[in-house]
């Protein structure tokens, strides 16, 4: 069993006791309630325990000592009813204030307490004892209190008394304990105007309306919770399908990449020489072009630009036919090759382009050199044909650089 007293009741009793000239006594008003305490252990096994709590809400002081009993401890019920009146059903105990005494119940107090328990019909009647102690020089004053619950076996059983707003306590004690208002004036005002604010059950009308709104909100919240739960389940299913589709797409990409790689490897194994053939032909053409004279061409243009390149520069120095090659011929001479052959000049330009650029210089020089060129070319050609009739084309093919045609491509001479 435990006991609790409100802060203003405790302060009122202490104030009345400290300002009195002698000892005094009175009655404690309140109620007894059952409080259930749940204890949950680490093994998730809960156990409930019921605790009886005595709550003191108010007090009723007596005018003087021995107001409802005599010196022998006999109680006068008429005087007791005159003091308590209609609050007799709210009595849960009585109290006594003594000065400079020990915190023990006297024999008279024990007799009075036993009679009050029988008259009021309260088996759990309690007794609150206040003692005021001060030093000789009045420098220190101490107010002590103790709560007793006398019974048949032991009269000095002490009960812990707690004050909700005294000490380092939590605010939950205010929610658990409710202190009713026992004022007569408050009761008369509520009785007169209570019909406007309270219904027949004593509950405020606004409170009932608030509870109705609260219930409606709770129903709506429960409905929304069901919808949210269903939508979350649908979302989880859709998310699973999306994840499966992503995995399938990634698998298809990997398979397609592997298939393309296999096709490329198979193509490379089937045609291994196809890629190397153009490179070899290109390198051969490049080799022919680069096999020409290494000397840089002269930037000065010769007087007779229509003459073909000198064969002595194209043939190797040790060629036996180098001394028998004809010297450059003029355009139109019988021994000069046709411009359509597109012989190169050694610097990458064709003879046709040079002929067209130097046309103005050729016209006034052709007449002077025609007779002389014809005689010399016929004689030299005759001598070369008698000495080496078949070695001239081979020599030209070996020593002549690749011919550049007007389209810019390099061509090897015929017979190469």
UniProtKB/Swiss-Prot annotation:
Residues 254-272 have a biased composition (Basic and acidic residues). Keywords: Cell cycle, Cell division, Coiled coil, Cytoplasm, Cytoskeleton, Microtubule, Mitosis, Nucleus, Phosphoprotein, Ubl conjugation pathway. Residues 254-416 are annotated as: Disordered. InterPro entries: BRISC_Abraxas2 (IPR023240), FAM175 (IPR023238), MPN (IPR037518). The keyword Cell cycle applies. The modification Phosphoserine is found at residue 377. It comes from Danio rerio. One of its GO terms (cellular component) is spindle pole. Its main location: cytoplasm. One of its GO terms (biological process) is cell division. Residues 363-378 have a biased composition (Acidic residues). One of its GO terms (molecular function) is polyubiquitin modification-dependent protein binding. Component of the BRISC complex, at least composed of abraxas2, brcc3, babam1 and babam2. Interacts with brcc3; the interaction is direct and may form a heterotetramer. Component of the BRISC complex, a multiprotein complex that specifically cleaves 'Lys-63'-linked polyubiquitin, leaving the last ubiquitin chain attached to its substrates. May act as a central scaffold protein that assembles the various components of the BRISC complex and retains them in the cytoplasm. Belongs to the FAM175 family. Abro1 subfamily. CDD domains: Abraxas_2. Residues 221-242 are annotated as: Important for interaction with brcc3 and other subunits of the BRISC complex. This is BRISC complex subunit abraxas 2. Residues 228-262 form a coiled coil. Residues 3-149 form the MPN domain.
